[in-house]
Design a protein with these regions (language model features):
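Conserved beta-strand segments of the P-loop GTPase G domain that flank and frequently precede/overlap
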Residues: 5-7, 33-34, 91-93, 122-125, ...
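Cytosolic-facing regulatory segments adjacent to core modules
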Residues: 79, 89-126, 130
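Walker A/P-loop NTP-binding active-site region of P-loop NTPases
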Residues: 3-71, 120, 124-125
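Conserved C-terminal guanine-recognition region of P-loop GTPase G domains, centered on the G4
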Residues: 158-171
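Beta-strand-loop-alpha "switch" segments that mediate conformational coupling across diverse proteins
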Residues: 183-231
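Inter-motif core of Ras-like GTPase G domains
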Residues: 116-117, 131-152
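C-terminal boundary of histidine-terminating zinc-finger modules
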Residues: 220-249
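Well-ordered beta-strand positions
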Residues: 143, 178, 208-210
Length: 276
């Protein structure tokens, strides 16, 4: 189906929290994938189904061993785990040292995500850098979402990142780049409008899609420290974080079947199992 990539420039403001929130409210079956080259956080943030700890060895690391012999999209499901609350996840690498030996993986993994049977993929790619190997995964996306704070330094870094990323991706078939502003609820609309004005004035190939509320209490509940399973449908479901995630998710899900990777199956894809 479709691949939606979440990333940021310097500081990666709330990308993992946003990825979990978006996946949790996604209107179709979805897989949350940790693709941060610096290492993932889900193992430390959220409990597995049944209340135990997620297995850090089952995920991108175990999938890499499979991919050395060729990777079919349906094989991704063999390396996923399920969070308490029912969300399927592909746990990321544990540190940057592991990523250094797996730079070849991102291209076949991106193709597999784009052709994944039965679900969209929300991929947390963390902080992007110039010449990053994970750019090969981004090429397969339906949409790339870049998160920013509405401060001078964050928006300045964002402008530079959009320009360099567009140059790296190149071509008319490059995925569209959307911007999400992580903003204080008290200045929410004004912050989104101002970032949109700056991006438009700079004539950058990106569009501000909306905002994510800066909601520390909602983020704490979503992290597992606030008993996620017990509070889902209650305070967490009504939090500013989840409400803003729903606004973004609806529009993104419609885009997720129309991007560059959505029309291209991974080589050798076989009809595989539906999400568990």
């Amino acid at each position: 189906m479709g691949l939606v990539v979440l990333a940021a420039d310097k500081g990666a403001p709330g990308v993992t929290t946003a990825a979990v929130a978006l996946a949790a409210v996604w209107p179709r079956p979805v897989l949350l994938a940790e693709c941060d080259q610096a290492g993932g956080d889900l193992v430390y943030r959220l409990p597995a189904e049944g209340g135990g700890m997620l297995n850090p060895a089952r995920g991108v690391l175990s999938l890499a061993a499979t991919a050395r012999r060729g990777l079919r999209a349906d094989q991704v499901w063999e390396h996923t785990q399920r969070l308490v609350g029912g969300l399927d996840v592909l746990v990321g690498l544990t540190n940057a040292e592991q990523a250094q030996g797996l730079t070849w993986l991102w291209s076949p993994l991106g193709r597999a995500f784009a052709g994944l049977p039965g679900a969209d993929v929300v991929a947390d790619c963390g902080r992007l850098g110039a010449g990053s190997a994970v750019t090969d995964l981004l090429r397969e996306a339906s949409t790339i979402l870049l998160f920013t704070r509405p401060t001078l330094e964050h928006v300045a870094h964002l402008r530079e990142r959009i320009g360099s990323l567009a140059a790296e991706l190149g071509g008319h078939a490059a995925p569209p780049i959307g911007i999400v502003v992580v903003a204080d609820p008290r200045e929410y609309r004004a912050s989104i409008t101002e970032v949109g004005r700056i991006i438009s004035h700079a004539k950058l190939p990106a569009t501000v899609l909306g905002g994510f509320a800066l909601d520390p209490k909602g983020a704490e509940m979503l992290s597992g420290r606030g008993a996620w399973q017990a509070q889902w449908g209650g305070r967490l479901d009504r939090s500013l974080l989840i409400r803003s995630a729903r606004q973004i998710a609806g529009g993104l899900a419609a885009r997720a079947t129309s991007g560059p990777g959505a029309d291209r199956d991974a080589q050798g894809v076989a009809s595989g199992p539906q999400p568990r």
